[in-house]
């Protein structure tokens, strides 16, 4: 499977199963002999992990514009320090959230100007773009229910936002997938994790065989 040096991102709303499916794909790729680097956003660098605590902490009074710029700052550090070198070395890079999360959450959910968000993403990422984006699509109510169980009833500052916010996020994810059908692979995340895992594996094999 000629997948060395490819960049795959996982996107979706709360509780869609992104981290679960990323871990399962990483395990299968490693079993196939591939070098894999698994990352998450925000995070992946000392700076990013500190900002993750700030951005996800319930009750953090962060203005939407400041929030968007913090995400872009974390991304710029991650791309320069980790992602770009790993891709250049031939590793497969898997990332739990990337540029599309900021567009969906900050432009879709928060209502910020999408063009400005995308401009910040271009500055943060340079020429680095995902080769494949796996969008795990799930009804927000169901996803938030899953997240509540996962977090033992202690939601982060995005999970506590209202249903309308999360519907807007989902709608913009759908728009992004329609605009770039060659990059996005959209799955029904309401199905059992094993079924989702198999569909992802077949798609990765198809694209990069």
Where are these regions (language model features)?
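Hydrophobic positions on the alpha1 helix immediately C-terminal to the Walker A/P-loop
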Residues: 21
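Extreme N-terminal, non-catalytic leader segments
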Residues: 1-7
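Walker A (P-loop) phosphate-binding loop of P-loop NTPases
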Residues: 15
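Conserved lysine of the Walker
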Residues: 18
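A glycine- and Lys/Arg-enriched "phosphate-lid" helix/loop adjacent to the NTP-binding pocket
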Residues: 102-171
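NTP-dependent small-molecule kinase module
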Residues: 2, 24-26, 141-209
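ATP-dependent small-molecule kinase phosphotransfer cores
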Residues: 32-125, 199
């Amino acid at each position: 499977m000629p997948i060395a040096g490819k960049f795959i991102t996982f996107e979706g709303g709360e509780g869609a199963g992104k981290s679960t499916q990323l871990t399962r794909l990483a395990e299968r790729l490693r079993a196939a002999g591939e070098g894999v680097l698994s990352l998450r956003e925000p995070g992946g660098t000392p700076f990013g992990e500190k900002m993750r605590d700030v951005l996800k902490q319930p009750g953090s009074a962060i203005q939407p514009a400041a929030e968007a710029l913090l995400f872009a700052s974390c991304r710029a550090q991650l791309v320069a320090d980790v992602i770009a070198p790993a891709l250049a070395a031939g590793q497969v890079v898997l990332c739990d959230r990337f540029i599309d999360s900021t567009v969906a959450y900050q432009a879709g959910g928060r209502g910020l100007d999408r063009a400005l968000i995308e401009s910040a993403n271009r500055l943060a990422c340079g020429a680095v773009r995902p080769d494949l984006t796996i969008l795990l699509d799930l009804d927000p109510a169901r996803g938030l229910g899953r997240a509540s169980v996962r977090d033992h009833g202690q939601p982060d500052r995005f999970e506590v936002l209202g249903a309308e916010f999360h519907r807007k996020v989902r709608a913009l994810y759908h728009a992004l997938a329609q605009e770039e059908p060659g990059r996005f692979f959209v799955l029904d995340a309401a199905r059992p994790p094993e079924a989702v895992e198999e569909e992802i594996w077949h798609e990765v094999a198809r694209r990069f065989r």
